[in-house]
């Protein structure tokens, strides 16, 4: 199928924008590549240190077997990462069977936003992405590895690992998922209880029971937030094996897919005939395919910030106009909570990513001619994995949706566009996701209420101060102010106001959770208020117009442009819960519209 003109045009624009940076990047990774095992270039003393704890040290010292490094984000705090506890032993066995040696190169931190939501620790969350990239870089700097396996799932972990994989772009990279937990209490029922609690209609016991029935076992949370958007992204970009993203943990199929991933890591090193450095996978076309997947699935707005940071590490420069233009051409094909009632397990059972990729390829809406760890183009990602004894066999995937309430073809989508809109106006530049927002709420014009943090909003709500249509402005939430915490804990509060019949919207230089849904939210507004951005000039009572249809965000006050910005007071977020250690990050973080990066 001929590539759609808009996808072709955006790809060419990215390629031209990135010409110099991508060329420099490719030259860098070419210089870093060496013939022979990576470890062979170390001195005997260096090598002895590297092999000292290994049972197969003789193989490592005397043979050309590839050595696979594991970078793991295992901990018990994240249900999504707990299954990784047993992966190193499984990977070692699989590696040895494939003629390779295996070492855990290092661990990286992994933070659960579900635990820190609305807490001071959330102000470390975004920066943890760059810490993860740095930690993975330290692990790989031993320069002993012919390929790398990256074990990570959740919000900042995958982006951080991709930044590291791109930085060490001469090293082949395979990403190994852990899979979603089995379905528990339906996400919409959990959300209803949260709103009831926010409204004072149920107590803490009812809320706790609902939360624990929803988050109940090892594996990724089942709603389609940032973690599961990451898993989609890795498959659409060719860094996962086909059909591996949404297979439940601790199952024979999950284990067999992990083994297959190890085999690919052993096969694509420079020691064989199929050398595939990570930097060759992470090109302009791969990032466009990732954005296409984000739009077709209605994925997390956090990736609008993470993808530019990931791409920059590979010399590719993305802009939010690229997201907007792709969204205008790619239809919304899935309804997964918060954009629908289904969870990711239901989505996978309905045909999942394989069906979706097949549809998008047939419509010319994604690039087929890309390099993937599977050794195929994207057509190989229409296949579904099946167990054949203890081995994986890929079979042709479904060409029809198995549940059109969850997954639809390109010809009959849930919406004509992907639902992500670029916003521009005198309040700055940002984005809004409207795939779960009712059409009558795409345009909101109302008076502003100004807040400096989300707790102030909740206090005003409890005091009964919201009695008319309101634009809730929460400013000083950008990366340089307080690390840009998610404002997801506002969702139940604003949803209650909306259910009471008020027209409400959020405008912020902060960000929302990938689980946020039905309330209009203009997010990532840049320049941020703490650097003197326009949000710092808004006053209580100003009339603001948020128009997602036209893509505009404006303060209508006549004297707006002549006002002096309110100064930011960093005292409330400069220390406590580790925040003092991240002052250097806050001082140099880039704007949200460019990835909010520290190390890229």
Question: For each of these PLM feature ranges, what is it?
Answer:
Residues 140-161, 172-176:
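A short, small-residue-rich loop immediately preceding and capping a beta-strand
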Residues 1-76, 80, 89-108, 120-121, ...:
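Catalytic or ion-coupling anion/metal-binding cores of large enzyme and transporter domains
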Residues 129-136, 141-148, 458-466, 471:
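Contiguous domain-boundary segments centered on the initiation and propagation of an alpha-helix
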Residues 105-143:
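N-terminal small/polar loop signature for handling phosphorylated ligands or for N-terminal nucleophile
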């Amino acid at each position: 199928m001929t590539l759609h003109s808009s996808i072709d045009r955006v790809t060419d624009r990215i390629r031209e924008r990135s010409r110099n940076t991508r060329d420099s990047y490719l030259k860098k990774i070419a210089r870093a590549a060496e013939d022979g095992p990576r470890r062979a270039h170390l001195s005997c003393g260096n090598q002895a240190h590297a092999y000292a704890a290994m049972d197969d040290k003789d193989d490592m010292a005397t043979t050309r077997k590839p050595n696979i490094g594991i970078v793991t984000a295992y901990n018990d705090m994240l249900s999504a990462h707990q299954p990784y506890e047993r992966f190193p032993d499984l990977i070692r066995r699989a590696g040895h069977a494939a003629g390779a040696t295996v070492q855990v190169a290092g661990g990286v931190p992994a933070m659960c936003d579900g635990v820190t939501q609305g807490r001071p620790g959330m102000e470390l969350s975004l920066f943890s992405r760059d810490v993860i990239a740095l930690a993975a870089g330290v692990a790989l700097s031993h320069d002993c590895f012919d390929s790398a396996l990256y074990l990570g799932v959740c919000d900042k972990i995958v982006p951080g690992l991709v930044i590291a994989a791109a930085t060490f772009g001469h090293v082949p990279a395979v990403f190994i998922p852990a899979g979603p937990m089995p379905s528990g209490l339906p996400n919409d029922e959990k959300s209803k209880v949260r709103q009831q609690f926010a409204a004072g209609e149920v107590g803490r016991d009812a809320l706790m029971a609902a939360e624990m029935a929803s988050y109940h076992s090892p594996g990724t949370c089942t709603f389609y937030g940032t973690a599961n958007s990451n898993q989609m992204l890795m498959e659409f970009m060719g860094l996962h094996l086909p059909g591996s993203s949404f297979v439940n943990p601790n199952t024979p199929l999950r284990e067999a897919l992990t083994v297959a991933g190890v085999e690919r890591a052993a096969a694509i090193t420079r020691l064989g005939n199929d050398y595939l450095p990570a930097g060759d996978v992470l090109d302009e076309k791969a990032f466009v395919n990732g954005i296409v997947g984000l739009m077709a699935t209605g994925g997390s707005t956090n990736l609008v910030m993470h993808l530019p940071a990931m791409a920059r590490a590979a010399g590719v420069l993305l802009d939010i106009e690229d997201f907007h233009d792709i969204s205008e051409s790619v239809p919304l094909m899935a309804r997964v909570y918060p954009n629908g009632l289904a969870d990711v397990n239901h989505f996978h059972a309905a045909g999942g990513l394989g069906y979706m990729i097949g549809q998008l390829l047939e419509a010319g809406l994604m690039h087929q001619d890309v390099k993937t760890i599977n050794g195929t183009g994207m057509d190989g990602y229409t296949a579904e994995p099946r167990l054949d004894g203890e081995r994986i066999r890929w079979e042709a995937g479904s060409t029809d949706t198995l549940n059109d309430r969850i997954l639809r073809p390109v010809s009959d989508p849930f919406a004509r566009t992907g639902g992500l809109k670029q916003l521009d106006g005198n309040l700055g530049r940002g984005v809004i996701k409207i795939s779960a927002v009712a059409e009558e709420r795409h345009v909101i014009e109302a008076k502003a209420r100004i807040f400096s943090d989300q707790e102030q909003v909740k206090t005003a709500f409890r005091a009964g101060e919201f009695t008319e249509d309101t634009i809730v402005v929460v400013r000083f939430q950008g990366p340089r102010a307080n690390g840009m915490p998610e404002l997801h804990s506002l969702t139940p509060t604003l949803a209650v106001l909306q259910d009471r019949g008020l027209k409400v919207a959020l405008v912020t230089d902060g960000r929302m959770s990938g689980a946020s849904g039905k309330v209009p939210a203009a997010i990532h507004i840049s320049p941020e208020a703490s650097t003197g951005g326009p949000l710092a000039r808004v006053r209580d009572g100003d009339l603001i117009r948020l128009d997602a249809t036209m893509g505009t965000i404006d303060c209508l006050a006549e004297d707006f442009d002549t006002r002096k910005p309110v100064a930011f007071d960093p005292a409330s977020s400069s220390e406590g819960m580790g925040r003092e250690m991240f002052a250097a990050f806050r001082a140099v973080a880039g704007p949200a519209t460019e990835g909010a990066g520290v190390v890229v």
